[in-house]
Design a protein with these regions (language model features):
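A short beta-loop-alpha structural element at the N-terminal edge
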Residues: 2-17, 26-27
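Conserved GNAT-fold acetyl-CoA-binding loop/helix
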Residues: 19-47
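Conserved acetyl-CoA binding element of GNAT-fold acetyltransferases
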Residues: 76-88
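Conserved GNAT acetyl-CoA-binding A-motif
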Residues: 106-120
Length: 185
């Protein structure tokens, strides 16, 4: 699995991907036509491409053997948007990895201390809670476009890369002998 920032030319494909996932898995969760209209207007590929070009939006993609299997976008203000994972790739940690990647981007590139997301449909708040987000609204739910959502926040994170180091066996022996000497003397 490879996660990378999408190029401007790839944004239209990411929009089509997100729209197809929305239509398959999410559209039925919303009750109002207003919610559907809002989504359709938001997912205008030309507008999102322009926002990416202007530095207002960044979109990451998750790829399995060069096949797009997940997308996640974030505004330059740290608001996470467009988290979609293809149903065939659910429960493999792809959404979590995409969220980690945008949180790292928020800290390292945008110098933001926290990010936000509107968990919509509202039942997705459980998922976001499991991956480190907390409700930002005391009442829990807000009403937007006639459907409920949960505003949530999480701290942005530093990218930490641990490089494994080989420690010689003699080092462990020396540490063990030193510890034993301290214990008995």
């Amino acid at each position: 699995m490879k996660i990378r920032k999408l190029t401007n030319e790839e944004i239209k494909g990411a929009c089509a991907f997100a729209v197809s996932i929305y239509n398959i898995a999410i559209r039925g969760c919303f009750r109002t036509q207003e919610s559907h209209r809002y989504f359709d207007e938001y997912m205008d590929a030309d507008r999102l491409t322009d926002e990416e070009r202007a530095g207002v939006l960044v979109v990451f993609g998750a790829f399995d053997s060069n096949v797009l299997c997940g997308v996640c976008g974030m505004t330059n203000e740290g608001h996470i948007t467009m988290l979609y994972v293809h149903p065939q790739y659910l429960r493999r940690g792809i959404g979590k990895k995409l969220l980690e990647r945008v949180r790292i981007y928020a800290r390292m590139q945008l110098k933001l201390m926290q990010v936000s997301v509107n968990a919509m449909p509202a039942y997705t708040a459980d998922y976001f809670s499991r991956v480190g987000f907390k409700s930002a609204y005391q009442g829990g739910f807000c009403n937007g476009q006639g459907d409920m959502y949960v505003p949530m926040t999480a701290k942005s994170i530093y990218q930490v890369e641990y490089t494994p180091r080989h420690i010689a066996d003699k080092t462990f022996i020396a540490i063990s002998v030193g510890f034993t000497c301290l214990v008995f003397f």
